[in-house]
Amino acid sequence: NVCYQGDCLEVMKDIPDNSIDCIITSPPYNKGYWSKNRNMNNGFKTKCRRITYGNFDDNLTPEEYKKQQIKLLEECLRVLKDTGSIFYNHIDILSEHQTIHPKFVYNFPIKQIIIWNRKNTPKLDKSYFFPITEYIYWIQKTKTSRTKFNRKKAIFNSNVWNISPATKNCFPAPFPEQLVENCLLTTTDENDIVLDPFAGSGTTGVACKNLNRNFI
């Protein structure tokens, strides 16, 4: 078990090919760019609340962000074992007129899209239905990737996971431990190596410790 502080794309260069059993991560959503009702080319404005990070302003141009995330996912596939899985969490950005969807993810071999129902209390807004869901893109490297569903737990019978966000956490957008544990129980064994390139508040590491997995 080890933690690194640095640019994940730089740190991952030192991780050997085909060495990671599972990758679970949620990147910054580039809300720094889309926040403050930024005007779009069609004259409409985005509706997005900025997330504040300690050492990253989360403010790339859409093209820069797309290139960054594609490079990240390419690196994830490089370090992932043929039997491994990636769980990549992302969201839609809303505007007054259209939804900005992370289409770049579809360049990769998605096995399934899991819907994370955060169960937030809806806020009133006159222009759209308040979003309470996020996407978890389950990406598998090959057809030989491991999958082991625990049929005793109803959560694994559906691609909609009803999990409330973590609350006792100072980080702006923390994973709930249950979400990470669902991914681990479905695709890993004890002592497997799990990578979270962004790490955030360290929830992936905590879940790995709870289930006797090794983490980076």
Where in this protein do the model-derived segments appear?
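Core catalytic lobe of class I
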Residues: 1-216
